[in-house]
Amino acid sequence: MNPVYSPVQPGAPYGNPKNMAYTGYPTAYPAAAPAYNPSLYPTNSPSYAPEFQFLHSAYATLLMKQAWPQNSSSCGTEGTFHLPVDTGTENRTYQASSAAFRYTAGTPYKVPPTQSNTAPPPYSPSPNPYQTAMYPIRSAYPQQNLYAQGAYYTQPVYAAQPHVIHHTTVVQPNSIPSAIYPAPVAAPRTNGVAMGMVAGTTMAMSAGTLLTTPQHTAIGAHPVSMPTYRAQGTPAYSYVPPHW
């Protein structure tokens, strides 16, 4: 191998950071390159039935016989052009195709003749490195972003004790709970004594009570005009309202 194009050495294991193993699949690079097979069809493979080999050869012979007319007079006459077909070859092709997909007793579908009629292998799920709890269960509400904070704080939902969860079915909301609290507004900064102090100064060097006295005229409440809304009625349709 050319180390420039293939830096991986033969027989080196595959990169498997999650240590997932699949039955029947190799876990490392092959030790040697596979032998060159000049044939297009792997006839020596057990999954390639002999019927398929005969079917391929018979079909190729049929195409070669249909390629050119056998007599030269058919080209000059006008009308329907009939290709000469070997009846025996067509019959053999049909027999080969029916033998390749023959019906095996006891199975509801057709199987190749090389496949055994035994019980299927037991179900083995693929190893999943992720836990099931990472994927939320579907609900009637759209999935919200787990890290997005809306205009309201949600009431924390706590799980019950393990023995209660074990013997009961606990259904918790996948989205915002019914009890919501408005987000608290940060209080305005107070005019404390420490506000006027600079790093490296003392209390005697600060302005003291001068910064604590109000320096401006208090502004009254701003009048807000509330529009008149229509009376609450029964809607003609029902839908799930968004949470925010």
From Swiss-Prot:
Disulfide bond positions: none
**What segment(s) does the record annotate as region Disordered?**
107-126
Residue positions, PTM N-acetylmethionine: M1
Task: State the Gene Ontology BP annotations.
Answer: positive regulation of base-excision repair
Under InterPro entries, the record lists: FAM168A/MANI
TM ranges are none
Q: What is this protein called?
A: Protein FAM168A
- Give the organism's phylogenetic lineage: Eukaryota, Metazoa, Chordata, Craniata, Vertebrata
